Swiss-Prot record:
Pfam families: Ribosomal_L15e (PF00827). Belongs to the eukaryotic ribosomal protein eL15 family. Residues 165-194 are annotated as: Disordered. It comes from Methanococcus aeolicus (strain ATCC BAA-1280 / DSM 17508 / OCM 812 / Nankai-3). The lineage of its organism: Archaea, Methanobacteriati, Methanobacteriota, Methanomada group, Methanococci. It comes from the Archaea. InterPro entries: Rbsml_eL15_core_dom_sf (IPR024794), Ribosomal_eL15 (IPR000439), Ribosomal_eL15_arc (IPR020926), Ribosomal_eL15_CS (IPR020925), Ribosomal_uL23/eL15/eS24_sf (IPR012678). One of its GO terms (biological process) is cytoplasmic translation. PANTHER family: LARGE RIBOSOMAL SUBUNIT PROTEIN EL15, RIBOSOMAL PROTEIN L15. This is Large ribosomal subunit protein eL15. One of its GO terms (molecular function) is RNA binding.
Length: 194
């Protein structure tokens, strides 16, 4: 079994492999860190490589912490009936992974988000590692696998739902029967697509 396959198998069931002990120690440090932290190398090298990561100049990885569960909605300031406040059980239309990608993009405004993957969770938070690309770096412009990100069509791609997590949330992973209202976009079909 190759090294990448070995890592992949271990992360399939982290609670039953050596990953559990590593995560227990890691998360004690992660909880004390800020929301967005740049990391030297990916925690899950197999997942990062499959999503387009390369150990070269112009490519960085950032770990982002996001809350778990439903939306933490602010309480209305003006008087309302408790029944109509709609405080609890409100779910965002955007996935937590997309929120993590957007936070990383705001922290590094000169970089574009390539992709992201999960690296752990506890009772309160989820952690994602986000791969970011510097589209103005010469080594990125000369790389055939990243060249299309430098054309200008992918500016602020994470805020337009063009990452893998964004397309999944917009329903673009489905096609055929049942996906008639998904394309070209949700708002183009009176929000009946999702």
């Amino acid at each position: 079994m190759s090294m990448y396959k070995h890592v992949k198998e271990a992360w399939k069931k982290p609670s039953e492999s050596y990953v559990k002990g590593l995560q227990w120690a890691r998360m004690q440090d992660w909880r004390k860190e800020p929301t967005v932290v740049r990391v030297e190398k990916p925690t899950r090298i197999d997942r990062a490589r499959s999503l387009g990561y390369k150990a070269k100049q112009g490519v960085i990885v950032a770990r982002v912490a996001v809350r778990r569960g439903g939306l933490r909605k602010p309480r209305p300031k003006h008087s309302k009936k408790p029944a109509t406040m709609a405080m609890n059980k409100i779910t965002m239309s955007k996935s937590i992974q997309r929120i993590a990608e957007e936070r990383a993009a705001k922290r590094y405004p000169n970089l574009e988000v390539l992709n992201s993957y999960s690296v752990g969770e506890d009772g309160k938070r989820k952690w994602y590692e986000v791969i970011l690309i510097d589209v103005n770096h010469p080594s990125i412009k000369n790389d055939s696998s990243y060249k299309n990100l430098c054309t200008g069509k992918h500016t602020n791609r994470v805020f337009r739902g063009l990452t893998s997590a964004g397309k999944k949330g917009r329903g673009l992973m489905n096609k055929g029967k049942g996906a008639e209202k998904v394309r070209p976009g949700i708002r183009a079909n009176k929000k009946l697509g999702k």
